[in-house]
Each structure stands twice: as C-alpha cells, then as structure tokens.
Design a protein with these regions (language model features):
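Small-residue-enriched flexible segments
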Residues: 1-271, 285-312
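C-terminal regions of mature proteins
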Residues: 278-279
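Short FAD-binding loop at a beta-strand-to-alpha-helix junction that anchors the flavin cofactor
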Residues: 282
Length: 312
C-alpha cells in the first residue's frame, strides 16, 4: 500500500455516500458546493468515486457548475479487479460501497497537467443503441442489450461482468480533431449488467449512438504510452514536478502467462519524471475509469493509463 501525504492550508476534502447513476449530479454538486464554501479559490479537483454504476459525465458537470469549466478534474473510479460486482471507497475510518470524495486544491502556484491513453482498436460492425434512459442501455439493434452485447462477444447471455469486462470495451467514435490529439479514433467505455438485460454505461448515452467492440493492441499500448509521456514532458519544460497521481486499467501491459504484466509499462511512464535520479511522490491506483482532459475539456475515460502531474 502507498500513502501520499498532503499538508498545508491550500486543500480541503469532502465525501458522500449513496451515489448512483440517477443521483450522481446532485451528490457531486453538494460535495462541490461544500468545497467552495470552505475555499472558493479551488482551481483543481481530485475525485474518487464508485466505479460500477454511476454517471461520470454528471459528476463532471456538477463540479464545473460550481467551479467553472476551467477547473481541472482528475482522479478515477474504484474497481474490483474487473468483476463489476462491488467496489469500495474509504475516507477516514468510513468505508462505503457507493461513495465518493473530492479533494480541492487551491495553491495558486500549483498546476496539474493531465492526459490519458488506451491503445485499443475498433473491430467489426457497430452496436446501435436503440433504447436508453440516461446512462442505462435497454436495447442494442432493437434487441435486449445484454443478450445482443454478449452475442457479439461470442458469449452466452448467462455470462457475468467478470467474463465481459476484460474483452468487451466499447468504443465511441471521436471527431478527427480529437482522434489526432488522443492517438486513437475511439473513446472507450466499460459496461456492466445490473437488472435483467439492462446495461449500465459509464456516462449518459443517447439513442442512435454507434458503439464498436474493441481489442487490445499491445504494440499500440506501448507506443501511445511513450507518446503521451513525451507530450507531457514538452508541456512541462522548465517546470518542477511536485507529485504525480496515476490511474490505470488492469487490462493494459504485457499479456504473459495468462495475466497482464504491468512492470514494464509503469517503468516507462515513471522514469521520464525522475528528478536527480529519484522518483517524485507518486500515487497510483488500478481503477474502473479515469478522469483527464481531452480537447481542452474534462472527460471521463475507460481502459486507459492516465497521468496527473502536479507541478510549479
């Protein structure tokens, strides 16, 4: 277990319990308002929330409605080793299954640079969302969502999330401009089965949206990781790294001996940020999804490596 300590007057923490898809906006809005009431100078917000069944775009929207769209949101949602059953969040001595917390930072000299990358490629014909409510998908291609999704994966409808999450990333097509910045044509999403054949999507999803099945490309995972680090280092030229937060998906790295080997991937992202031969304070977690900017906006990602470099 790794611990990163933060001290001083320029941060504050708040949390909530009972956050779900339907109330994600209201719960996050209440936390953001509490943060602002304690420190109106907050200019960046770290979030950790339950990852399995909330609407992450609603969380972003709530924070921005309080602090404005210029606030940088970074962090992740918690996972359970890709099982999609239950995840945990801890604040102080309280452990919850459907909780979230925010950490607001207000040091005017402290900045954060964020970026995410995945390295998966889209395959086959898209699934079309033909019926949805908020972040819940009811039908793909006019058929019960879970049945059609598992059929496209070559699995039976009795499969569970532990079977589908490692191989069933869905891709939303990006604009050409965003694809060039992202290094990929698609933004990935994780889905889980909750009630009947309904599926929980990671964000709100509109009817008519096309979603592609994807497959991991090991070479692309590593080349895009290198590209991301190079770009971040260029943007930070002349700056001093203070600390690094890091959120990562378990489905990334070298696939060997029926498991994912992460050591090489982690070393490739850490070494470029060393200062005088030493790694800066670095706190990483395996998550369900990651928050990082794309196209100048706060965006929720899945199946990525995301780095959040705090610097002065």
């Amino acid at each position: 277990m790794a611990l990163m300590a933060v001290k001083g007057p320029d941060f504050c923490v708040t949390s909530c319990d009972g956050i779900y898809g339907a109330n994600a906006y209201e719960k996050t809005l209440a936390m953001a308002n509490e943060i602002k009431s304690r420190n109106a100078q907050v200019n960046m917000v770290y979030i950790l929330a339950s990852g399995i069944d909330i609407d992450n775009d609603a969380c972003i929207r709530a924070i921005e409605d309080v602090f404005g769209t210029d606030v940088t949101i970074f962090g992740a949602t918690s996972s359970d080793n890709m099982k999609g059953i239950v995840s945990y969040q801890a604040v102080g001595d309280l452990v919850t299954e459907h909780g979230a917390y925010l950490v607001g930072f207000s040091d005017p000299d402290l900045k954060v640079d964020t970026q995410a990358t995945h390295g998966f490629v889209a395959i086959g014909e898209p699934l079309v969302v033909t019926k949805s409510t908020g972040h819940v998908i009811h039908e793909f291609n006019g058929k019960p969502a879970w049945e059609e999704y598992t059929r496209m994966l070559g699995l039976g409808s009795d499969s569970n999330c532990g079977d589908t999450i490692p191989i069933g990333a869905l891709g939303e097509k990006l604009s050409d401009e965003l694809a060039l910045e992202y290094g990929n044509k698609h933004l990935l999403r994780v889905v889980t089965k909750r009630v009947g054949n309904d599926m929980h999507y990671a964000t709100a999803i509109s009817e008519g949206t096309e979603l592609w099945l994807t497959t991991r490309d090991e070479d692309l995972i590593f080349t895009e990781m290198d590209r991301m680090v190079v770009e971040m280092k260029k943007r930070m030229e002349g700056k001093t790294t203070v600390a690094v937060f890091h959120a990562d998906c378990l489905a990334r790295g070298r696939f060997l001996f029926n498991r994912i080997i992460k050591d090489e991937l982690v070393s490739k992202m850490q070494y470029p940020f060393y200062i005088n031969g030493e790694c800066p304070p670095w706190l990483g977690m395996y998550g369900f999804g990651e928050f990082a900017r794309l196209g100048g906006k706060n965006v929720y990602h899945n199946y990525t490596t995301a780095l959040y470099v705090l610097y002065k």
